[in-house]
């Protein structure tokens, strides 16, 4: 089964959207959740995926080596972005979609969570948070998803690179 670049980019987007309500928050003692700050550090941290955990995050039917080669090829073609410095051979790294897609998703996630009463100082109980997280992910997908699909269509090559 051939996996296209489009499918990989959309898998990165889906992983980002599903994780955002959890990684844009802090988990506190007493099973409470509060918003993380809305600065650049937390935006990067919340929207990046570690190359070591790519298989679990992306859930693509690719081997370990093949998924790594394909992600690196997308980075080389500037379809994905490396967070932080460029990795040396054999090192793990963090990758993500460009900031023009992830920053609006991060900001919208925080705005929606504020709508549920969560702030940096007002916490929500962890019990029942999965339902809130799913609603937030769905809302982010419906609002920012069309921009991502447009980006993916622009990025998709007519001739896919097979490594």
Regions found by a protein language model. Give the residues of each.
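Short alpha-helical "packing" element that flanks the helix-turn-helix/winged-helix DNA-binding module
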Residues: 7-12, 31
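Short intrinsically disordered terminal tails
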Residues: 1, 157-163
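Short helix-coil-helix linker/hinge
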Residues: 2-6, 18-22
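Short acidic, hydrophobic short linear motifs in intrinsically disordered regions
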Residues: 21-57
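Short, amphipathic alpha-helical interaction segments positioned at domain boundaries
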Residues: 99-131, 135
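A short, conserved structural fragment
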Residues: 75-85
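Short, Lys/Arg-rich nucleic-acid/phosphate-binding segment
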Residues: 84-93
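Short amphipathic alpha-helical interaction segments
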Residues: 61-76
């Amino acid at each position: 089964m051939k996996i296209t670049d489009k499918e990989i980019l959309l898998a990165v987007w889906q992983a980002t959207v599903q994780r955002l309500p959890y990684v844009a928050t802090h988990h506190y003692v007493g099973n409470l959740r509060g918003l993380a700050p809305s600065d650049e550090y937390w935006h990067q941290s919340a929207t990046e995926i570690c190359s070591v955990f790519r298989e679990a995050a992306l859930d693509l039917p690719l081997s370990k080596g093949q998924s790594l080669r394909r992600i690196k090829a997308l980075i080389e073609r500037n379809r994905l972005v490396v967070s932080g410095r460029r990795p040396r051979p054999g090192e793990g790294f963090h990758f993500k979609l460009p900031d023009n897609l992830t920053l609006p998703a991060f900001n919208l996630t925080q705005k929606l969570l504020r709508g549920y009463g969560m702030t940096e100082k007002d916490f929500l109980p962890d019990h029942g948070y999965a339902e809130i997280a799913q609603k937030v992910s769905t809302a982010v997908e419906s609002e920012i998803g069309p921009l991502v699909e447009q980006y993916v269509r622009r990025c998709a090559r007519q001739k896919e690179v097979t490594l």
